[in-house]
A protein has these predicted regions:
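Glycine- and aromatic-enriched membrane alpha-helices
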Residues: 1-411
């Protein structure tokens, strides 16, 4: 065992584990007080459901051997059977399993932000269980497994721009459209605790650094690069959103700045192990700009109730990051970009369109697979029960109605 690399992955695993409760705090601060606890429950219940799914068969589907198609693994590692020894970096294989579990958790948790305030908890649990199995595990295998279909074609996704963010953002949007908009008026959709959301977002940011740097698999130059460019991209994303609000609305907001922070982090996620510092400046800025205008179009023009903007931030941001990888990927940062069977450096580095075309192809696969399977899962569930709570429950608030608790009680 390599003690340094193993300790590094343990630290990164803890940081990524922090992301799920941090996201619950971030989300719950942005809803009305009557739905605070329900939002936390929706987000954190994935810890129980998806963690167990991952141990039983999720990891095996994601990283197990397949039958040659490169689409999904088999049951060889059912209940983590056969997980022993160390990988090439001297990290215990079981530690890699748990590190990757954290990615599966946060992917499912992101989806819940699109559905706050009206979806039944049981419906959500069933959906996330099947979505994680049929979408997340399949994409993880195709893009990250050594036998994966998209990996063999040359697609690059360092830390989950497609596997985690595009897939969850698209699923959230499909769910929001199928479940329907919240019945409450615009005033009743405002954030009840911006400081609470701020704390959650900052903890999410801290965890994200382990998410991106840890994807290197060991403590090396690529991990350090991922760590640094993630911070820079987040800063650019935050500032870009604030400036846009300042120019357009004359009032920069904290929630807007936090949205820009997340957009910058999402955008750099697939690229952080492949791009140089100057590229992170561009990626963070443009991801934030595209997410800003995408959010405005979806929320105010189309009037789709993607409640906490999962698609606008994670879906659009992930797409921006995937394309940016095809533009800026550099062998100077990561020699794997020009390794055997790789497609070479990004367009702005090499002048070749090969990697960019493959990145766009992989993005389309992520969008179509997640949209189609999410629609089918929700459609099947709707044949047996309503997807959303009754209107009187929604008006009263889901905290009291579904959980018998209140987030805040005055003495």
């Amino acid at each position: 065992m390599n003690a340094i690399n193993s300790s590094f992955i343990v630290l990164c695993t803890l940081l990524v584990l922090l992301m799920t409760p941090a996201l619950a705090m971030f989300y719950s601060g942005m809803v009305r007080s009557k739905n605070t606890l329900n939002t936390i429950m929706n987000c954190f219940i994935v810890f129980g459901v998806i963690a167990l799914q991952w141990v039983v068969f999720g990891f095996s589907f994601s990283f197990g051997k397949d039958e040659g198609l490169g689409l999904v693994g088999n049951f060889e590692n059912f209940l983590l059977e056969g997980i022993s020894g160390y990988n090439a970096s001297g990290v215990p294989n079981i530690l890699f399993v748990i590190f990757q579990m954290m990615f599966a958790l946060i992917a499912s948790a992101i989806i819940t932000g699109s559905l706050v305030g009206r979806i039944k908890l049981g419906v959500l649990v069933i959906f996330l269980l099947f979505w994680s199995t049929l979408v997340y595990d399949v994409l993880a295998h195709m893009i990250w497994s050594s036998e994966g279909f998209l990996l063999k074609r040359g697609s690059l996704d360092f830390a989950g721009g497609g596997v985690v963010h595009i897939s969850s953002g698209v699923a959230g949007l499909v769910g929001a459209l199928m479940v329907g908009a919240r019945k409450s008026d615009d005033e009743d959709k405002n954030a009840h605790s911006i400081p609470y959301a701020f704390l959650g977002a900052i903890l999410l940011f801290i965890g994200w650094l382990g998410f991106n740097a840890g994807s290197a698999g060991e403590m090396n130059d690529v991990a350090i690069n991922a760590f640094i460019v993630s911070i820079i991209s987040a800063a650019c994303g935050f500032l870009s959103w604030v400036v846009l609000e300042w120019l357009i609305h004359k009032k920069p907001t904290i929630l807007g700045g936090l949205s820009g922070l997340v957009a910058g982090l999402v955008g750099i996620t697939p690229a952080c192990g492949y791009v140089d510092i100057y590229a992170s400046l561009v990626i963070g800025t443009l991801s934030s700009v595209f997410c800003y205008f995408g959010l405005s179009f979806i929320k105010y023009k189309l009037k789709w109730d993607d409640s906490l903007d999962a698609f606008s931030l994670h879906g659009i941001g992930g797409i921006c990051g995937g394309i940016a990888t095809g533009l800026f990927a550099s062998a100077k940062v990561n020699p794997n970009v020009i390794a055997q069977n790789a497609l070479g450096e990004g367009f702005f580095i090499s002048g070749s369109l090969e990697l960019l075309k493959e990145q766009i192809f992989a993005i389309v696969i992520c969008v179509v697979l997640s949209a189609l399977i999410s629609f089918v899962i929700f459609k099947i569930i709707s044949c047996f029960t309503d997807l959303r709570v009754k209107e009187e429950v929604e008006q009263k608030g889901l905290d009291v109605s579904l959980h018998g608790e209140k987030a805040y009680t005055l003495a």
